[in-house]
């Protein structure tokens, strides 16, 4: 397992990408989370689309001085292309609400809920969204044996991109007593559901479509598989019976709306092989915008090219009063 670190950066890096345009967009990317590199790659395509759309664009690699830099730059809108801590967890939306700067993507509460796996799990179950059996394990519990019958999944509470996720199978040489809790003092342990990996893109409350992930090399949809070409195939649209496909879209819209999301989101599910039962995994309020990313791919299938997708996201920019 790789260990991806959060990096504390004092000063933001600011670059003017386009000095003229109809509105001034601050494209926020990079930042201090373990998903920094994913965010930077996502921002490359977004910046090109924003310039193509005729916006004045300033790129900001976010540091701890971000409030001061925003006061200096005075953008009309912030395009939140951050992933992980400080950008995806509700921190940046909170700051932008105070500064009264409109921003893309979800607000404080929906971002924080979706990012924290304990609280999102409680929210899902409260709203009758089916999930795999799961428990919270604290480092202080000093558990020596498997906390659940194998196979099971270990998930850090607040990491995206499957960073830190491990699947423990019956044959694995793994002793839970040796697990070092690399991403905080709590983890979620969930029953591993063998089945088909399904992803749904939602934009402004409407599900655009679903695709299936077919693993080619690794045993589960981990960080390496998500961001390495040739490790998985995307089947778009997902080859499902019409009634099941429709149910998937309806469930995704339900999650999006009950969590009061804004702009783009990606809902993730497992379809159990033996029972055809859907299990929700999570909703991601800051889906990737890379060449291999799922939301742009599904949007293209729905007739929305990448540039138009970015324009639709910009249209939702607002702050919470």
Curated annotation (Swiss-Prot):
Ranges where the ATP-grasp domain occurs: 121-315
Reaction catalysis annotation: 2 D-alanine + ATP = D-alanyl-D-alanine + ADP + phosphate + H(+)
Cofactor note: Binds 2 magnesium or manganese ions per subunit.
Any GO MF annotation of the entry: ATP binding
CC per GO annotation: cytoplasm
Ligand binding (Mg(2+) 2): 282, 284
Pathway: Cell wall biogenesis; peptidoglycan biosynthesis
Pfam families: Dala_Dala_lig_C, Dala_Dala_lig_N
UniProt entry keywords in alphabetical sequence: ATP-binding, Cell shape, Cell wall biogenesis/degradation, Cytoplasm, Ligase, Magnesium, Manganese, Metal-binding, Nucleotide-binding, Peptidoglycan synthesis
A GO BP annotation: peptidoglycan biosynthetic process
InterPro entries to which the protein is assigned, alphabetical: ATP-grasp, ATP_grasp_subdomain_1, D-Ala_lig_Van_CS, D_ala_D_ala, Dala_Dala_lig_C, Dala_Dala_lig_N, PreATP-grasp_dom_sf
Cofactor needs: Mg(2+); Mn(2+)
PROSITE patterns in alphabetical order: ATP_GRASP (PS50975), DALA_DALA_LIGASE_1 (PS00843), DALA_DALA_LIGASE_2 (PS00844)
Annotated residues for binding of ATP: 147-199
Record Gene3D superfamilies: 3.40.50.20, ATP-grasp fold, A domain, ATP-grasp fold, B domain
Cell cycle among keywords: no
Entry's EC annotation: 6.3.2.4
Record-linked HAMAP family: Dala_Dala_lig
NCBIfam families: D_ala_D_alaTIGR (TIGR01205), PRK01372.1 (NF002378)
Described purpose of this protein according to its UniProt entry: Cell wall formation.
Protein name from the UniProt record: D-alanine--D-alanine ligase
Organism: Rickettsia conorii (strain ATCC VR-613 / Malish 7)
